[in-house]
A protein has these predicted regions:
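General beta-strand structural signal in soluble alpha/beta enzymes
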Residues: 31-33, 84-85, 178
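Amide-donor transfer/coupling interface in amidating biosynthetic enzymes
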Residues: 1-5, 113-187
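Short gly/pro-enriched beta-turn/loop segments at secondary-structure junctions
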Residues: 3-6, 42-44, 76-78, 84-85, ...
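Cysteine-nucleophile active-site neighborhood
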Residues: 55-128
């Protein structure tokens, strides 16, 4: 008998708002929480899913939710499974830098993201990559960038034409993170 995967999904109106309904429906047992206002119960889950959105527009609230950020970092360090896409990946990084200042995030990934106006650059398109023998497909849409050099990827990412792109994919313990919004129904 197949084990039921208990999934906790970050969701709110903007910071973590980009969810394919088909992906949500594909998870067997789902609960939601708002990282801006709720401390998640991570004790009885098999997967934490941090989808995309616009965390850079709500940095004060995410910064003030320090207990939530700490709980997510501790969960990752204990080997908890996390899938983080775009805004979710940004949230797992060390910090997000804006024109107003630098905001510490979860600190699971040792990178900084810039959302400064001068650094804005559109990254857009369909993406695919193979990791651990599985093919992942999705799309990329963001204006934020890594501060400094783009960190190394654990696999090569390709666009719809099969051409390599510089979008990195990260694996840390049981964390999978990328700017790519994954269509997990196929994966």
């Amino acid at each position: 008998m197949e084990k039921t995967i208990r999934t906790l999904i970050a969701r709110n109106d903007e910071s973590f708002s980009f969810l394919y309904q088909e992906v949500v429906d594909s998870f067997q047992q789902v609960r939601f929480f708002d990282p801006e206002t709720e401390l998640p119960d991570l004790s009885d889950i098999d997967l934490l899913y941090l989808p995309g959105g616009y965390p850079e527009k709500h940095l004060d609230a995410l910064f003030k939710a320090e207990a939530t950020r700490r709980a997510i970092k501790d969960y990752a360090e204990r080997g908890g499974r996390i899938i983080a896409e775009c805004g979710g990946m940004m949230y797992l990084c060390e910090s997000i830098v804006t024109d107003e200042g630098e905001y510490p995030m979860c600190g699971v990934l040792p990178y900084k993201i810039t959302a400064r106006q001068a650094d804005r650059k559109l990254s857009l398109g369909y993406r695919r990559f193979i990791l651990d023998g599985k093919e992942y497909r999705g799309h990329e849409f963001h204006y934020t960038q890594f501060l400094g050099e783009t960190p190394p990827s654990v696999t090569q990412v390709y666009n719809a034409k099969g051409e390599p792109v510089a979008t990195p994919v990260f694996k840390y313990k049981n964390v999978l993170a990328s700017y790519t919004h994954l269509y997990l129904v196929e994966s």
